[in-house]
Amino acid sequence: AKDGDVKGPAGCMKYKSGDCRGKTCCDQQYLWYKWRNLACRCFTVEVFKKDCWCNDIS
């Protein structure tokens, strides 16, 4: 495998590739020399503002 390769449904979202709310993150992505499990995670970036992206939950 090489960096950026993914496992998951067609059209799934890669690591930090945009807002994942209501979308499907890839199951896994090859990052930093190993397979990482991805899931949509939301973080408070400012008061009353959340950003959500596909994050490494390995």
Curated annotation (Swiss-Prot):
A Pfam family this chain is assigned to: m_DGTX_Dc1a_b_c
Q: Keywords, A to Z?
A: Disulfide bond, Ion channel impairing toxin, Knottin, Neurotoxin, Presynaptic neurotoxin, Secreted, Toxin, Voltage-gated sodium channel impairing toxin
**What InterPro entries does the annotation carry?**
Beta/Mu-DGTX-Dc1
A GO cellular component annotated for this chain's UniProt record is:
host cell presynaptic membrane
Its annotated function is as follows: Acts by delaying the inactivation of presynaptic voltage-sensitive sodium channels (Nav). Acts against insects and cause a progressive spastic paralysis.
- Compartments where located: Secreted
Domain comment in the entry = The presence of a 'disulfide through disulfide knot' structurally defines this protein as a knottin.
Task: Please tell me whether the keyword Nucleotidyltransferase is annotated for this protein.
Answer: no
State where it is primarily located.
secreted
Question: Is this entry keyworded Disulfide bond?
Answer: yes
A single MF term (Gene Ontology): sodium channel regulator activity
Q: Which tissue types show expression of this protein?
A: Expressed by the venom gland.
Disulfide connectivity?
A: C12-C26, C20-C40, C25-C54, C42-C52
Instruction: Give the record's family classification.
Output: Belongs to the neurotoxin 26 (DTX) family.
Protein name (Swiss-Prot/TrEMBL): Mu-diguetoxin-Dc1b
